[in-house]
Structure formats: C-alpha cells, structure tokens
Design a protein with these regions (language model features):
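Bacterial Sec-dependent N-terminal signal peptides
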Residues: 1-27
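N-terminal maturation segment of proteins
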Residues: 21-575
Length: 575
C-alpha cells in the first residue's frame, strides 16, 4: 500500500541508540529510568496515600489535599534544569507536566461542579464530621449520631419531593451529585462498620436510624442520576443504545491531550481517504475470487468459511503460529521466549459477546465463538464474523506482536511510564495489520478480503464515532453504516456500537486504532525506510519506551527533544 503519510518538518541530525531487548548489568541506567522518574514515583505514592486516607468522593477536604499535592509537584517539576535533561527525560517531563495539569484541571472542575450541587446535599458537612472523627477512633456520641442520622433521613425525604419537581439536571452535575451522595453513603458505612458491635452506646442508638438513612441515600443517589439531561439529549432510536455525545469542543480538547494535531473533521477526511484505498483493493480481491465488482458477494463467500463449533481455538492457534513464523522469517521483531510461553486462552461468555462480538487479547486471548445455548441466528452470525480469513488480520493484533507483547514489555521496560493512551496501545496493534499486509502476509484473495474487512472497520470506527459525538449520527445510523458500508453481521455491528458508546470507553478510543497505526507507519517510513534502523531494531526499541503519545516516541527515536512548553505539531498525513 502507498501511504499518503509524511511528517511536516525537516528531520534534524539524530544519533539513535538502539537498545538490546533485555537488560544486562552493563545496560545504561537510562534503559529503566530518568531524572523525572524519581519525581513521578514520589508523586504517585503521595497521591495514593492521600487518596486512601481522604476516601470520601468529592469531599472538600479530599479535594483540598489533592489540589495541594498536585500544585506541590508542579512546582517541584519546574525546579529541574530542563536544558540539561536528555531526550527521554525531556519526554517524561513534558508528559508528566501534561498529566499534572490535567489532574489540576479535573480537580478544579470538581470544585466548580460541587459548588453547584450543594443544594442537593445540605447534610454533607454533618456526615463529613462524623467520618473525620472516626479516622483516629474517637469515642462516638451514639445518641448524637442517631439524632443526626434521623435528621438526614428527614432532609432526604424533603429533597426527594423537590427533586421530583425538577425537569432535569445537567448530566455533569447530576453525575457529580449522585457520586457525592454515594460517597457520603460509603462514609457512613465505614463509620458503622468501625463502631457497631464494638462501642456499646453506638450499637444501642445507631443501627435503626443508620439503616434508614443508608437505604434512602441509595435511592436518592439513583433518583438524582435519573434526572440527568445531556447538552445533546439522546432518545432511544430503536437500537436500545443511549450514550452521551460529548460535542466538538470536547473532542478537540481530547485530541490536544493525546497530541493529535488534527480536527475531528480532518480525521474523518483521513478515514475516508483510507476507506477509498480499501475499496479499490477489495474490488481487486473480489475479481480474483470470480465475483467481479460485487465485493459484498465475495465477502459473503468468505464468511461461510468458518470452522465447525469446537474447532475455533485450534484454528486461532494455527493463525498465531503462522504470524509468529512470518515475523521471525522477515526479521521484523524479537520475541522473548517467556512472552511466547505464557500467553493464555479462554472462551468468551455469551454475555461478554454482546459487547465484544470478536475476540480480545493481551496476556489472555479471549475467543469469541458461539455456545450451545445461543439462538440459532446468533450462533451463525458469531461464526461468520469470526471466520479464519477475518481473524488472519487480528490474531497477531491481539497476541504477538500486538497486545500480548505490549503487556509483557510494559512490565519490564521503563515501568514508571504509565502514560497510557489508546493511540499507543491500539495504534501499535493496528500498525501490525498494516505492516503485515505490506509484507505479503495474506496468501489468498480470501485472506486479503478478511484483512481488508478489518481495515475498513478501523476506518468506519473513526467515521461513525466522530459523527456520533459531534451530534450528526444516531447509534442506529452507526449500526447501519457498519452493516452497509463494511459488511458486518448486524448483531456484531450492534455489539460494536454498544461497546463504543456505553461500554465505558473513551470517546476517542475507536479513533485511536487507525490514527495511531498511521502515526507509527509514518515513523517507520522515517526510521526504517530512511535507513536509521532495521525493522527489528525499530520495533524492539519502540516496545522498550513503554506507553506514551506516538509523537513522543518519535522524539526519542530520532533524538529530537521536545520544547519545554510543548504543543503538538507533528503532522503525519498528507491529504
């Protein structure tokens, strides 16, 4: 494939050090650490200690202490002499600074929203005071606590009537208020667990008023959440999927955080260009199969080539063995023997398949295939959607050199870099789909159609998820798009859309596959095609950097240190 990918600025002279895959006593210290690491370790420990001590969700006391520690470490980081840091340490500085600023912003948002919801939790300070004295085991005034709990119950009943008259509460405020009520409920539960049965007067006075207050707090939290209204309110369009579109401004904010210098509209344009390439290649494969330009008929034929029930694990292992042998033969990457030895298999439950209709991976390879108690049509859709030709594109995505190798490497190289981003996680796994296509891994037209199906799917993910979040498409339109434009089985398309919008994933998660993959492919063109490293050196080095935005991996690979006040500017795609 000819990728329309460039980097938009001239390369600087770079001295790139290729590290050995496994550490040895002679290995440079920077293989595992940097000057910024020391601060990061201290921050993580301090933040954790405070979070575990001040446990009440959204409480002012907790927020004040966390704001204090974040600001303290922002100032500590500024005291480092940035100019004297090496490139890897500068990358750590830039990303850690970004994370601290984001943490600060999140806490400030929490404070702003909390001030707007205090009318719904007028009893909060009473509970905070009860919880605070419990921390050091003060002798409780059982009768006083019982009186306070009784008053809280009365207050909640009054608030429930007030809430019933509300037409709605902005989703962010409803979510914050509900979480705060649940936090207060947990605080009371901790007090009750600590004293009840141990302190005689507490045990005599408190149980009945506590149980009433506890029950009402749970009901009240749910009632508040039920009143949430979105800026872009969603009704059930028949799909049963009701998510929360975040809007263009939030998407752009997220893209800046992930160091992606493109707008949502530009990313959709990238997806459409990649889709057009897939269309051309799909027609070629369809003709080679004897179906002419009727690529959907060719796709249907490929779907019928599923393996019988009970044989999917064996078929997947065969594909895994082929992909690992191919990567070795072409000297694309080093695999530690332990990484090959210790990945595991399991079968996905029918319930999990509603959200993940295809297999998932990592150290545990979870196989999606029908069980005996599934409906007949669901069985066939699962088998058709997980046929070996489709899976040829994704077994290496989930195992080696994809997610399983990522998990293996992340626990062994620069483990302090917990800069998790789907553009690294999913981008790397998708990159291997692109690379193995270019290297000739698909053997037959059926293999090509299977791999193209998944590449079209990655393009479609960008298009449907961004159109949904900017308010253009409904979930049902997204499902129909996957069925009509990509050729998905309808049940699989529904599962994919459900997973995207109500599965707890970041709004940019589905975008990250193809965009992250294209970023890495662009870097490969600079580093490998440019003669700076071999494939094996490039891929081994990439894994040793651990998770971070791809632009920062590139800075390390090319020894091009980022500026202290960094702003993403690395354009990697030519329109």
């Amino acid at each position: 494939m000819k990728f329309n990918i460039i980097f938009s600025f001239l390369l600087l002279p770079a001295a790139v050090t290729v590290q050995a895959q496994m550490a040895t006593p002679a290995t440079d210290l920077y293989q595992q650490t940097s000057e910024v690491n020391n601060i990061m370790v201290q921050y993580r420990a301090d933040f954790g200690s405070l979070s575990r001590f001040y446990t009440v969700t959204n409480s002012p006391e907790r927020r004040t202490r966390l704001l204090g520690i974040v600001n303290q470490y922002i100032n500590t980081l500024k005291q480092l002499n940035y100019d004297k840091l090496n490139t890897g340490a500068k990358v750590d500085y830039v990303i850690f600074q970004r994370n601290l600023q984001q943490q600060l912003s999140d806490l400030q948002t929490e404070e702003k929203e909390y001030k707007q919801i205090t009318q719904w939790i007028p009893f909060a300070d009473t509970i905070y005071a009860i919880e605070k004295t419990r921390r050091r085991g003060a002798v409780p005034d059982g009768q006083k606590i019982a009186d306070e709990l009784n008053n809280i119950t009365k207050s909640i009943k009054s608030l429930q009537k007030k809430l019933a008259g509300e037409t709605g509460i902005q989703v962010e405020l409803a979510t914050r208020a509900s979480a705060s009520v649940n936090g207060l409920r947990e605080a009371l539960a901790n007090v009750y667990l600590f004293y009840n049965g141990y302190d005689p007067l507490f045990t005599w006075w408190v149980p009945k008023p506590y149980k009433k207050a506890d029950s009402l707090l749970g009901v009240y939290a749910n009632a508040i959440l039920a009143k949430k209204i979105s800026i872009n309110p969603q009704k059930d369009d028949g799909s049963g999927i009701i998510g929360n579109p975040i809007g263009t401004a939030k998407l752009i904010e997220g893209l800046q955080y992930e160091m992606i210098p493109y707008t949502p509209e530009e990313l959709v344009e990238i997806a459409n260009k990649e889709f057009a390439w897939c269309d051309k290649e799909m027609l070629k494969a369809s003709r080679d199969m004897g179906f002419g330009d009727d690529w959907k008929a060719a796709l249907e034929k490929v779907k019928t080539k599923y393996v019988p029930a009970g044989e999917q694990p064996t078929a997947m292992l065969k594909l895994y063995d082929e992909s690992v042998a191919f990567i070795r033969e072409h000297k694309l990457m080093t695999f530690a023997p332990l990484a090959e030895e210790t990945w595991r298999m399991r079968m996905m439950t029918p319930r999990q398949q509603l959200v993940n209709p295809f297999f998932t991976g990592g150290e545990t390879f979870s196989i999606s295939y029908p069980t005996d108690d599934m409906e007949h049509e669901d069985k066939l859709m699962s088998m058709r959607g997980n046929n070996p030709h489709f899976s040829r594109a994704t077994v290496h995505h989930e195992l080696l050199a994809g997610h399983a190798l990522q998990q293996f490497s992340q626990s062994r190289f620069k483990v302090y870099r917990n800069f998790r981003t789907p553009f690294w996680t999913e981008g790397w796994a998708l990159y291997w789909e692109l690379l193995l296509w270019d290297q000739g891994f698909p053997k037959t037209p059926e293999d090509r159609i299977g791999m193209l199906f998944w590449r079209m799917h990655r393009c479609a993910r960008i298009i449907f998820s961004l159109n949904y979040h900017i308010g253009k498409w409904t979930p049902q339109q997204c499902i129909d798009f996957l069925v009509d434009r990509v050729g998905h089985e309808r049940a699989n398309a529904e599962g994919e859309v459900r997973r995207s919008f109500v599965g707890g994933y970041d709004p940019l998660y589905q975008v990250a596959y193809m965009i992250g993959g294209l970023q890495i492919m662009a870097m490969k063109r600079e580093v490998v095609d440019g003669g700076k490293m071999s494939y094996q050196q490039f891929h081994d080095n990439f894994m040793q950097q651990n998770a971070m935005p791809i632009e920062m991996v590139r800075a390390i690979m090319l020894n091009q240190p980022p500026k202290k006040e960094f702003k993403t500017n690395c354009k990697f795609y030519k329109f």
